[in-house]
Swiss-Prot record:
Its EC number is 3.5.1.11. It comes from Pseudomonas sp. (strain SE83). One of its GO terms (molecular function) is penicillin amidase activity. The keyword Hydrolase applies. The lineage of its organism: Bacteria, Pseudomonadati, Pseudomonadota. Belongs to the peptidase S45 family. One of its GO terms (biological process) is antibiotic biosynthetic process. Disulfide bonds: none annotated. Keywords: Antibiotic resistance, Hydrolase, Zymogen. It is an enzyme of class 3 (hydrolase). This is Penicillin acylase 2 proenzyme.
Length: 774
């Protein structure tokens, strides 16, 4: 070890906060015990609710302060102050969205209980800042000091983590693809081949005029997509699995819930494992550092719940027509005044950036220039209306049944979920937890004319009308970002979602397990069977012998392949090389490679040509639809893809090719520290189509870029038999033994104990700390 490396390691060690002994915390009414188990997971026991949330804020700051502050900065358009020019465009976008204004608005509208929860939580965060404990190493690298927290900051953090997830990116993509391939072919680029209702939208002459206006905005949309970077990829490429099994189908005679949320791999991960108890509740689950409570995955000893993204259409894009001076926008036969102001962001290592913020009746301009006559505005559930999701967070801990839990979520709107639940009485259920505006179905296809008055919101779809079921016949519930309603559902809810492959495979395995056990959940988590192996084998067998020996050998390899994207499979690597070659070919022949002609084409599905075509190719091939091949047949395309793919075969197992790269947000800025900041990774299997959903960027390479941030299984009623895992560890400190200690079991699709009984926690605790009133 060099002296410099030793010094760096010593600095990392010095940044670790003390996790044992006694600490005085202002505002506590009674002592709070914090015990950490062998995986560094905190178990917090307080007397009262306010003390519990205060302690959670303190413990979050102990383990994840840098992450919390960076997320807050990203939410408020201040990340470039730390990350430099690479974060500037994203900062400008969230400033235009008005994040601070809407979060302050939401806080003022919350009930007293939610306000008290938020105040107690940030008081705990601020108590850590004032405690004199060492700061995370990142502050020393940046030469920065932490800033105090205010209650509305937690709302900003929560809103940032679901920022613009879902439909906005699909609408922008179709806007770019439509002039290239036409409406009929653009329909085929839907993720899930969900229906035919889009063929006639927008209709007739209006379509031609709208296409011309939208095409003129293409450079501005390109810039918007580039600004979002990995955030757009998360919004479009992420996903999740979850499922519930009723008592009549389990070996235990009790409900079992399991699943895994899929997002872009960020260090630290967006979730932290916590256990929080007081006189009102005893909850364990995944928390969001910077946010009090358990919004997505948890149980309280009576009811367990978990979520996947429901892909409800909660964002609308409007094409606006402005007067020459850009100060008014057309609506009907009138031009209305628009709000216009100037803002500025600071950029580390560079000059400040000034920019205009323009808002019409529909929302802020996010692409285009009003001074050039046209621009796109966004009206999103996440920003346009007051959100009371944090009121839901205070009600959810008190639920004892699935039905009570669903009633507690009334008004949730920050992001849309399939909320799957099970309770100790034996019920299981599914609810689409979302606020969805009532408006024309046409809004789901493209940006719509903002001047016509025909695409306005007309209130909300009632909570009671959202898709839900409790105790369904058959005793099985599965969601995996698949379509939850048909295109002809009475209320317009969604246009885009993920293909049904993962949901179908999970259901297939559950149906085959009449006595489902907790141990069976890990086997489903680890399922690597590609849904396309049968189609691929049939087409390649019919294709016949290839002219070149390497292409023929590849054809035979793929025909013989068992269809499993296993880490050790060389055939899985060959399949990926072939599918990427076929995707590039279809993208090129269709002309879609020109739809976004800049380096942002490397962003995952939803906004890049190859990303969209990647998902569409299996359906096109299954239907023998060669409409985008410009005169080629599929046999010609398959032969060419075989030939091209042979040039990219490495002979390595899929896991080595697919190994993710976990990158700390400061490692590029401080490369000498990268080896210490970046956690190690291991070979992993799966791809974006398999239940083991470790997805990739088709245009960039085979490396996994998103996957399961966590896996979990709830044994409802026998809570100590529940299990979980996260992809790196409980701590955000690179020197902590718990920074990446869960990566080994995660890579093997194993889980660690979810300790719930306090006597067992006491017996297995590795550290214990008492927080006492100051």
């Amino acid at each position: 070890m060099t002296m410099a490396a030793k010094t760096d390691r010593e600095a990392l060690q010095a940044a670790l906060p003390p996790l044992s002994g006694s600490l005085s915390i202002p505002g506590l009414s009674a002592p709070v015990r914090v015990q950490r188990d062998g995986w560094g997971i905190p178990h917090i026991k307080a007397s009262g609710e306010a003390d519990a949330y205060r302690a959670l804020g303190f413990v979050h700051a102990q383990d994840r302060l840098f992450q919390m502050e960076l997320t807050r900065r990203k939410a408020l358009g201040r990340a470039a102050e730390w990350l430099g020019a690479e974060a500037a465009e994203a900062d400008i976008l969230v400033r235009r969205l008005g994040m601070e204004k809407v979060c302050r608005r939401d806080f003022e509208a919350l009930g007293a209980e939610a306000k008290d929860m938020l105040r107690a939580y940030v008081a705990g965060v601020n108590a850590f800042l004032a405690s004199g404990a060492p700061l995370p190493i990142e502050y020393g690298l940046l030469g920065a000091e932490p800033e105090p927290w205010e209650p509305w900051h937690s709302i900003a953090v929560m809103r940032r983590l679901g920022l613009l997830m879902g439909s906005v990116w699909f609408k922008l993509w179709r806007m770019l693809a439509l002039p290239v391939v036409g409406a009929a072919n653009a329909l085929k680029l839907r993720y899930d081949d969900g229906g035919q209702d889009l063929l006639c939208i927008p209709p007739g002459v209006e379509a031609e005029r709208l296409e011309a206006d939208l095409a003129a905005l293409r450079p501005a949309v390109d810039a918007l997509l580039k600004a979002m970077g990995g955030d757009a990829s998360d919004a479009a490429g992420g996903g999740s699995n979850n499922w519930a099994v009723a008592p009549g189908r389990t070996a235990t005679g009790r409900p079992i819930l399991a699943g895994d949320p899929h997002r872009v791999f960020e260090i630290p991960g967006m979730y932290a494992q916590h256990h929080l108890a007081c006189d009102r509740f005893d909850m364990i689950g995944l928390t969001v550092p910077g946010v009090p409570g358990f919004p997505h995955f948890a149980h309280n000893g009576k009811v367990a719940y978990c979520v996947t993204h429901a892909f409800m259409d909660i964002h609308d894009l409007y094409l606006e027509q402005f007067a020459e001076d850009g100060r008014t926008a057309r609506f009907g036969n009138e031009f209305e005044p628009v709000a216009w102001r100037r803002d500025r962001i600071a950029v580390r290592g560079g000059a400040d950036r000034e920019f205009d913020i323009v808002e019409t009746r529909h929302g802020p301009v996010i692409a285009g220039d009003p001074l050039e006559g046209a621009a796109l505005t966004l009206r999103s559930v996440q920003f346009a209306e007051t959100d009371l999701s944090f009121d839901c967070l205070t009600r959810m801990p008190g639920a004892s049944t699935v039905a009570q839990l669903y009633d507690a979520t009334r008004g949730w709107g920050l992001i849309d979920h399939n909320l799957v639940a099970g309770d100790v009485a034996g019920s299981i259920g599914h609810l689409v937890r979302a606020r969805v505006p009532s408006r024309p179905r046409e809004n789901g296809w493209l940006p719509v004319p903002g001047w016509s008055g025909e695409h306005e919101w007309r209130g909300w779809i009632p909570h009671e009308a959202m898709p839900r079921v409790i105790d369904p016949p058959g005793g099985l519930i599965v969601t995996a970002n698949n379509r939850v309603v048909a295109d002809d559902h009475p209320d317009y809810l969604c246009t885009d979602c993920h293909p049904p492959y993962r949901a179908e495979r999970i259901m297939e395995r559950l149906v085959a397990s009449p006595a489902f056990a907790v141990d069976d959940a890990a086997a489903i988590h680890a399922d690597t069977l590609s849904p396309h192996v049968g189609l691929l084998r049939a087409r390649l067998e019919a294709l016949g012998i290839q002219g070149s020996l390497p292409a023929e050998e590849l054809r035979q390899t793929l025909i013989a392949w068992d269809g499993r994207m296993d880490a050790g499979s060389q055939a899985a690597s060959a399949y990926n090389a072939f599918r990427r070659a076929l995707t590039r070919l279809v993208t090129a022949r269709s002309g879609l490679e020109q739809a976004i002609a800049h380096p942002f084409a490397a962003v995952p599905p939803g906004v890049s040509p190859q990303g969209q075509v990647w998902w569409a190719v299996p359906t096109l091939l299954r239907n023998d639809d060669a409409g985008m091949l410009k005169g080629w047949s599929w046999d010609e395309a398959l032969s060419e893809a075989l030939s091209v793919a042979t040039q990219n075969l490495t002979g390595r197992g899929w896991g080595e090719e697919h190994r993710p790269r976990f990158t700390h947000p400061l490692s590029a800025q401080f490369p000498a520290w990268a080896a210490l900041l970046n956690p190690v990774s291991r070979p992993i299997g799966g791809d974006g189509d398999t239940v083991l959903a470790n997805g990739l960027v088709p245009s960039a390479g085979p490396e996994a870029t998103y996957g399961a941030l966590s896996r979990y299984v709830f044994d409802v009623g026998n809570w100590d038999n529940s299990r979980w895992v996260v992809f790196h560890g409980a701590s955000g400190h690179p020197a902590s033994p718990h920074y990446a200690d869960q990566n080994a079991p995660w890579s093997d699709c194993a889980m660690v104990p979810m300790l719930y009984s306090w006597d067992r926690i006491a017996a297995e605790a590795v550290t214990s700390q008492e927080l006492v009133p100051a």
